[in-house]
A protein has these predicted regions:
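Generic low-complexity, intrinsically disordered segments
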Residues: 1-3, 8-13, 18, 30-32
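Helix-rich terminal scaffold detector
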Residues: 2-4, 24, 28, 32-45, ...
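Short, low-complexity N-terminal leaders and the immediately following helix N-cap/first helix
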Residues: 28-108, 112, 359-384
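Short, glycine/charged-enriched hinge/interface segments at domain edges or termini
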Residues: 33, 42-45, 94-260, 397-398, ...
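Flexible glycine/proline-rich
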Residues: 61-66, 70, 74-75, 121, ...
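Short, conserved secondary-structure segments in the cores of folded domains
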Residues: 73, 85-86, 114, 124, ...
Length: 443
């Protein structure tokens, strides 16, 4: 979904509005038209709703079955043939007529003439006649004339004959044709997420490809003169660009296709240059440059283009969250602090990516847990602590990962959940019930 704004970039597919403002002189300290007066501060729920209102599922595309895991079906799938396509044996054993072995017992076995063998993937060499049998393998087609299989451990071969030691009923150890699916049966409805198990069913139903909702192409931009790549030596005031790599991984984990725009310096023109390929993307995710500092150019540039929806959320960590558009492409600007970036991704970017893929389960299920640490919160904010949850008998207990500073990335790496403290709550005492968002399985 694209927005109408005054934004235009050289080389983009959109043309400049005749009323667009002239570009301002390039300056590292230029902050565009940011109004430093109080701006509306949205709740987390309001901000997420505003973002999702601007996001729509992508168009459908054909996807080879082997590449469809995790994708969302754009249309229902029906079986093109019966599954299984023929009645087959569920056991290694002997194909028999049940009536021929009705009197069999260990003390008085029934003797049947052995006509041959049926292997999986081959046609039976003969039909089963009265008082005869065929050796049969698991998955092999049931020979004509037979209606049951005696397990190999319940019989013995001697001198070209088979001794059957137990009776069996008609249908024993068989998989009937069409018992899994009949031709025309619904295999999966539109909107279903494709799992490995479903891929197997789709393959058995005759499908080699499926129509899936598209995967969103996400342009990722990190900003800041201080950023250096992992492994590079750090000079005074410089830090490693962790956000770039955590975002790339998080976007791919959520089903997005990354367009890596690299690192923009704190210069207006470099920021513009990095956004030239925005027309190739369906979402832009940036980090840094969204607050009120003199070098926070991202928000200033977007304000100048009248492309900002909101830029403050009553959230800790991550209050300066920007939602805007670049040449009509939605942009979510996350703060530069590493933990703020990841919390913002979880609360806002991940739901947007899932919606673009046709998912309806946009938020992770929440659980109630008992906190083992006191939690202190500014009551005007909704705070998300990083926690480690574990199952303790019939309840879930949770404790903090340690230092909760928004710069302490390890607090997020060690966490398997987020602990939610809502607005209006100042303190949560040890032993109190809290809401948590599991990020990984809780043992």
């Amino acid at each position: 979904m694209r927005w109408r704004t005054k934004w235009s970039l050289p080389g983009s597919t959109r043309t400049s509005s005749p009323t667009a403002r002239a570009a301002r002189p390039s300056s590292k300290t230029a902050t565009g038209t940011i109004d430093r007066s109080a701006a509306p501060v949205l709740t987390v729920a309001q901000a997420r709703e505003r973002i999702l209102e601007r996001i729509a599922p992508l168009a459908a595309e054909d996807v080879p079955l082997a590449q469809a895991r995790g994708r969302v079906l754009a249309e229902e799938v029906r079986a093109e043939r019966d599954v299984p396509p023929f009645t087959n044996s569920a056991m290694d054993g002997y194909a028999v007529r049940a009536v021929d072995v009705r009197t069999a017992s260990p003390s008085q076995p029934v003797h049947l003439s052995l006509l041959g063998e049926v292997r999986a993937g081959a046609a039976p060499p003969a039909a089963v006649q009265p008082n005869t049998t065929l050796r049969i393998m698991t998955g092999a087609m049931l020979p004509e004339g037979s209606d049951a299989v005696v397990r190999v451990e319940d019989a013995a071969e001697r001198d070209g004959a088979v001794e059957v030691r137990i009776p069996v009923e008609s249908g024993t150890s068989l998989r009937a044709a069409g018992s899994d699916l009949r031709r025309g049966d619904l295999v999966a409805a539109a909107g279903r997420v494709i799992t490995p198990g479903l891929i197997g069913v789709l393959a058995s139903a005759g499908r080699t490809s499926v129509r899936c909702v598209g995967r969103p192409r996400v342009l990722v931009l990190t900003t800041g003169d201080e950023l250096r790549e992992p492994g590079e030596s750090l000079g005074p005031g410089q830090i490693t660009n962790t956000n770039r790599y955590t975002l790339l991984a998080a976007i791919e984990d959520a089903g997005g296709v990354v367009i890596d725009a690299g690192v923009a310096r704190d210069e207006r023109q470099d920021l513009l240059d990095r956004l030239r390929n925005v027309h190739q993307a369906q979402l832009v995710v940036s980090t840094g440059g969204v607050s009120m500092g003199a070098y926070d150019l991202v928000r200033g540039l977007l304000e100048e283009k009248e492309a900002v929806d909101f830029w403050q959320v009553a959230l800790r960590p991550g209050k300066p969250l920007l939602f805007a558009a670049v040449s009509g492409v939605p942009l979510i600007g996350l703060p530069g602090n590493p933990v703020s970036t990841l919390v913002g991704f979880e609360l806002f970017v991940r739901p947007a990516l899932l919606k673009m893929q046709g998912r309806t389960d946009l938020e992770r299920p929440r659980l109630t847990a008992i906190t083992e640490d006191p939690l202190v919160n500014p009551p005007h904010l909704e705070q998300y602590f990083r926690g480690i949850a574990r199952r303790d008998g019939g309840r879930v207990a949770v404790k903090l990962t340690g230092d909760q500073g928004s710069h302490v990335l390890r607090s997020m790496a060690d966490a398997n959940c987020l602990i939610v403290v809502p607005q209006g709550t100042r303190e949560v005492a040890v032993g109190s019930a809290v809401e948590i968002i599991p990020l990984a399985p809780i043992d």
